[in-house]
Every structure is written in C-alpha cells, then in structure tokens.
C-alpha cells in the first residue's frame, strides 16, 4: 500500500468543498470550502491549497442521479472543473461517483454537531471527505 496524499473536491456552482487524505490510512479530513461564481472558483485560492498540500492525485466528485446517469446541467461542469485542475496544476485528476455524498455528509455532521454544524461550507467539505473515503474504499476492492 502506498502512502500517497490525495485531495478531493466536491464541485458546486456556488461552493466547492475540499478534503485531504492519506491513501495508506484510507481516511480523509475536511479542508475548506471555496466560494464559486457560477462554478468558477478563485483559482489563486485553489492554487495556494494545492501548493500547501502537494497532493499526488486529485479526486473530483462526479454528480449523477441515483442510477448513476450523468446529469445534463452539473455533470459536464464538474468534468470541466476536473480538466481545469489538471491543466492548471499538472496533477493527475480522477472523477469519482458522488451519489448520496451530500446526504451522508449532512448525517455525519448532524450526528457530531447538531443543526449548528450544518453550514453550507461544512456540508461541502464533509461531502469531499465522503467522496474521498469512498474513492479509497474502491481502490481496495
């Protein structure tokens, strides 16, 4: 098992959550939520985080419906965000199914902090944690 550092993003048109994890432990921690204008973040802020953590790989959540079918409105935008991450920073980027990640993130946050923990930024970052930990589980089969 390698010890790569993996960063994850939960793409949204208004907010993009992020998380960081270690492949060797299969666990992730929330980082920060980036405000976005119609899906476009402040790339300087993203760059600072990528330089600080220097991930070996970036995982971006791929929005789909409950059957795994891509959504016409948001899925292409998440793919574009992933392509831009690769193009701007030269990092390997993988897409990962994010079905039900927001619901799971809300449940996790509520369990530990009640309603006060359910801010938009917290939910987006916890969703990135769920996406990354799901990606780890898929790697181990």
Swiss-Prot record:
Keywords tagged on the record: Cytoplasm, Hydrolase, Nuclease, Ribosome biogenesis
Annotated family: Belongs to the YqgF nuclease family.
A Gene Ontology molecular function term of the record: nuclease activity
Organism, scientific name: Aliivibrio fischeri (strain ATCC 700601 / ES114) (Vibrio fischeri)
Main location: cytoplasm
Superkingdom classification of source: Bacteria
Name of the molecule in the record: Putative pre-16S rRNA nuclease
Subcellular location, record wording: Cytoplasm
Lineage of producing organism: Bacteria, Pseudomonadati, Pseudomonadota, Gammaproteobacteria, Vibrionales
Enzyme type, top EC level: hydrolase
SMART domains, A to Z: YqgFc
């Amino acid at each position: 098992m390698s010890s790569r550092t993996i960063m994850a993003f939960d793409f949204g048109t208004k907010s993009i959550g992020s998380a960081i994890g270690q492949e060797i432990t299969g666990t992730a921690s929330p980082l920060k939520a980036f405000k976005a204008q119609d899906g476009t973040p402040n790339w300087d802020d993203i760059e600072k985080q990528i330089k600080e953590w220097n991930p070996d790989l970036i995982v971006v959540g791929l929005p789909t419906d409950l059957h795994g079918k891509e959504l016409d409105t948001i899925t292409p935008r998440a793919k574009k965000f992933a392509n831009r991450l690769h193009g701007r920073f030269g990092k390997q980027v993988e897409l990962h199914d994010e079905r039900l990640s927001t619901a799971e993130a809300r449940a996790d946050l509520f369990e530990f902090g009640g309603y006060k923990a359910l801010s938009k930024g917290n939910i987006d970052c916890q969703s990135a944690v769920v996406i990354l930990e799901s990606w780890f589980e898929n790697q181990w089969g």
